[in-house]
Amino acid sequence: MTRGLVFFVSTACGILADQLSKFIITANLATGTSIPESGFFQIVHVHNTGAAFSIFRGHIEWLIAASVLGVILAMTAFFIRKKLPFLDTRPGLIALGVILAGTVGNLIDRVRLGYVTDFIRVGDFPTFNIADSCLTVGVIGLLLLYIVSSHVSGDTSENV
């Protein structure tokens, strides 16, 4: 599989997993209810009109604009990946692909519904969804790849 295809497949799989999971939750669990009713891990159907941790709640236009900017940045990174060696690898392109998937997954909800469907609750952490997980895992993955590639290439620019 070519590297470009790796990027697009990881993006498509992330979007599909996100949208399918939200469809299943919406079709089977009334808003505000959870399974189980209490406990450390719950599946709970909530509508989030904000971003992570519900910040910028009610500012859908800003969140849509930020998401569109995120899509543009991810696509730009894909097209200039040859200049970023840590990114022009299968793991780098998978990480970038799931970042794009998370951005697009939540953007679809915001444009279509005016809110994002969240449904995973772990402990006291704010409720989130597959798109949020894609974004988090992708960003952490890219950071780790960058750190490792900097050490492997002998980059000592931080000592200058």
Swiss-Prot record:
UniProt KW Repeat keyword: no
Keywords: Aspartyl protease, Cell membrane, Hydrolase, Membrane, Protease, Transmembrane, Transmembrane helix
Pathway of action: Protein modification; lipoprotein biosynthesis (signal peptide cleavage)
Membrane topology: Multi-pass membrane protein
Cellular localisation: Cell membrane
Transmembrane segment boundaries: 60-80, 84-104, 128-148
One term under GO cellular component: plasma membrane
Signal sequence segment: none
A GO BP annotation: proteolysis
EC number: 3.4.23.36
GO terms assigned for molecular function: aspartic-type endopeptidase activity
Active site: D118, D132
Pfam family, one: Peptidase_A8
Catalytic activity: Release of signal peptides from bacterial membrane prolipoproteins. Hydrolyzes -Xaa-Yaa-Zaa-|-(S,diacylglyceryl)Cys-, in which Xaa is hydrophobic (preferably Leu), and Yaa (Ala or Ser) and Zaa (Gly or Ala) have small, neutral side chains
Purpose of the protein: This protein specifically catalyzes the removal of signal peptides from prolipoproteins.
Family: Belongs to the peptidase A8 family.
Protein name from the UniProt record: Lipoprotein signal peptidase
Organism: Dehalococcoides mccartyi (strain CBDB1)
